[in-house]
Regions:
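Short, surface-exposed amphipathic charged segments that create phosphate/polyanion-binding patches used
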Residues: 1-4, 72-81, 133-138
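Conserved catalytic-core segment of nucleotide-activated headgroup transferases in glycan assembly
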Residues: 1-51
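Donor nucleotide-activated moiety binding/catalytic core segment of transferases
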Residues: 41-91
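Catalytic binding pocket for nucleotide-activated donors in carbohydrate/polymer assembly enzymes
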Residues: 52-54, 83-156
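C-terminal alpha-helical cap of glycosyltransferases
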Residues: 155-177
Length: 177
C-alpha cells in the first residue's frame, strides 16, 4: 500500500508538502501505508531533510526513480502544485490533491470537477480518514477506481479536442470578431 508524493519544483510548495508528509506519516503509523517522496529533479530536498531528519519515520521513503516507475508501484498519489497529477491519472493511480495553506489554487484537477467526483482538495485529517476508509471499504475503493478510470479516459481522448465549432470560435477570436 504505497502512496506517492511527487514534489513540485516550486520551493515553498515542496517544503509545505514535505512537512505535511511528516504529519501524515504519524497519522497513518498504525496502518500498512508506506509514503514515498519523489523529489523534483530541479529541487534538492537535502537541506530540508537534514533540518527535519528527526521527523523521518519508518513509513516514509525517498526515491529517485522516475515518476512513471513509482506510479507503477504506488496505488495512490498525493499532489500539491505539480502537473504530475496528470501523469498519475494516465498511469491509473488514484490521485488526491492536498490543500495548501500557502496557495489557494494548487488543485491541478479542479478543472474536471464538474464531470468527475472525488477531485476536491483534502486537508490532512480528511485525507487520512479517506485513505483508511478506502483500505477498509472495497466498494468505495471500486467507486474511486471507476471515477479515476473515467477521468483517465477523458485525458486520453483529449478533453479539449479541436472540432469545427471550436475552430470557428478560435478563428473569429483571432480575427477580432
Amino acid at each position: 500500500n504505497k502512496i506517492l508524493f511527487p514534489l513540485s519544483q516550486i520551493k515553498d510548495s515542496s517544503k509545505e508538502l514535505i512537512n505535511k508528509i511528516f504529519v501524515l506519516s504519524k497519522m497513518l503509523s498504525k496502518t500498512n501505508y508506506k509514503l514515498v517522496i519523489k523529489p523534483h529533479p530541479n529541487f534538492s530536498i537535502k537541506k530540508i531533510l537534514r533540518t527535519n531528519s528527526n521527523l523521518l519515520s519508518s513509513n516514509i521513503s525517498i526515491s529517485n526513480q522516475s515518476v512513471d516507475e513509482l506510479l507503477d508501484k504506488c496505488y495512490f498519489s498525493v499532489f500539491m502544485a505539480t502537473g504530475a497529477a496528470y501523469n498519475a491519472i494516465l498511469k491509473g493511480s488514484i490521485a488526491f490533491t492536498l490543500e495548501s495553506e500557502l496557495n489557494l489554487a494548487d488543485n491541478y484537477l479542479d478543472i474536471f470537477q464538474d464531470k468527475n467526483k472525488y477531485l476536491e482538495s483534502h486537508d490532512l485529517v480528511s485525507l487520512k480518514n479517506l485513505l483508511i476508509e478506502l483500505k477498509n471499504d472495497k466498494n468505495k475503493l471500486i467507486d474511486y477506481q471507476n471515477e479515476f478510470l473515467k477521468l483517465r479516459t477523458t485525458l486520453i481522448n483529449g478533453f479539449n479536442q479541436a472540432n469545427n465549432e471550436r475552430l470557428e470560435i478560435f478563428g473569429n477570436f483571432k480575427h477580432g470578431n
